[in-house]
Structures are given as C-alpha cells and as structure tokens.
Amino acid sequence: MANNVSRDVPQDQSSVAQARKPWYAFATVAAGRFVRFASRVTKHGGSALPGKVVEKIDPGFLTRTLGQLPLGVVLVSGTNGKTTTTRMGASMLSDLGLKVFTNPTGSNFVRGVVSALLTEVTLGGKLDADSAVLELDEAYAVHFVKQVKPRYALLLN
C-alpha cells in the first residue's frame, strides 16, 4: 500500500460528501450536541440519537469528517474482542505520538461513531486527529464502509 494517503472522496459519494458552507457545519454540530445534551439531561443516554439527527441533517458528515484524517481509519469488527483490540490499537498509535480518535463509549454502530465524533470535532466540523481506530459491530461494518473506506480492517472471530 502506498505511503501517501488519498483524501479524495469516491465518485459515488461525492455529491453527499461535498464541502458544506461553514454555517452549515456549525449548525450540524450544534444540533447534534444539543440533542446529546437533552438526551443526557432526560436520562436517555445519548449515544445514538445525536448521530441519527446529524445523519438526517447532513448525510455526508461521517464521510467528510473522517476524510480529514491524514493516516486514515482502522476498522475493528467481529464477534469477540472488538473493544480490547480497539483500545490496544488506539493505545499503540497514541504511544507513537499520533492523535487518535476512537469511539470509547462502546456505541459500535454508524450512528454511535457519528455521536462520538460530535464530542471531538470543533463547531466548524474540524477533527484534530491523525488517525481513527473504530470498533464496529459486524452487522453495521458493511454500512460503515459504504460511507468511509478504511485504510485497514481487523476482522476478529
């Protein structure tokens, strides 16, 4: 695999993931954060609903946000060992001095990743990380790779 990382959006996703106006990115992140806050205040958790709202407002949010990562995405999926493997991988990359985004709450489906991103992105939609190590349930990994092409995938049994 080449050392340079392409940030180009695949042809089939270009219309969805094209850059939005700055106010739109702000509105998307602000709405998602508000829903997360409201969910937690009302004791409803808030790990999936903010992601659902953001997906409705801006279907290209996930693709565009993770597309900012210069070293790409590592996807961890399978039946057993996802959380441990994800934490070990993120820890190893952090020990190398890289800034790593991960979904630490265990909300391991696409909406959960979007919700986790809301805590890390700026209100302008910028993600300050070099790479992401993401745990995804095997049933949702297929939906994830339709939006984001991981640089590496670890499939566990």
Can you annotate each of these PLM segments?
Residues 7-157:
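Phosphate-binding loop of NTP-binding sites
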Residues 3-5:
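Actinobacteria-biased recognition of intrinsically disordered, low-complexity terminal regions
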